[in-house]
Amino acid sequence: MAKIFCMLVVLLVSSSFCSAKDLKRSKRQMQVYYMCNGGVSQYPCNSNNNCNNNNCNFNNYGNQVILPSSFYNPNMNCNSNCNNLNCNQYSGSWLNGQYVAYNMGSNAYSPCASSCCSNNNNNYNPYINNNYNGNYNPYGTSNGGYNAYGTIPVNVNVPSSSTNTNVNQYLPYGAQQFTGTYQNGQFFCGATEPSGGVCRNNGVCPSGHSCVAGNVCCRCPVGSSAGNCILQSDCSAGYECMGTGYCCPSQVLSTTKLGPCVDGACPLPGYTCGVGDLCYPDSYFL
């Protein structure tokens, strides 16, 4: 009995020591940081750290954000420096003042991409482009040379803002630019693919979505997607692998009038339902 008691005492002491050690390690790894311009600082935002109150934690108060001490340290989170990381393979968003990135293939959280890709290091992003009116234009020319779509196509199925004010309050930059539908309070990319909602915080969208024309979060700049992809060869004819990791319609000209298919057909004469669940002019198929 005495032997068993001694063993229990040893186990309890050992367990307590380990718990205290783990707690101490945990406290050492967690420190208080302040977010500033997408970066991180150990000083409050009103201190001399090249930051003002308006850029701290997305509010005017400079609230502190608790992050792991290595969260924004690429040397600890990555096998090599940020220059060797392809941010196109990751999709991220700002959550509570910190940038969190996920692998678009496995949807796994990546500390390395979260460290390196927060400052728009993605050179392949044909979606979020800020034009003169503050409109996110995926068809503009200011997207790093990638201009597959040219100027914004016209959505033939969405009413004008003067006749559809209830919908357009969610589309502050014009419903004519969104090639999707609005049904029962929800936006659909193309006709049937649910959107990721309305873009927030200057173009922020859920993982796997990007802010497209009309200020809506979609997997593709126009129409609906056709499966996941990493390489162009993963997509079928008429689609290309886009930065969100989805196959998206590629055969779109800048002057094309597009609209979503309805039950596999087009409501307007002279159009045929095609790639991306979009209505194309019949001339496309001649």
UniProtKB/Swiss-Prot annotation:
<protein>
    <recommendedName>
        <fullName>Uncharacterized protein C35A5.10</fullName>
    </recommendedName>
</protein>
<dbReference type="InterPro" id="IPR006150">
    <property type="entry name" value="Cys_repeat_1"/>
</dbReference>
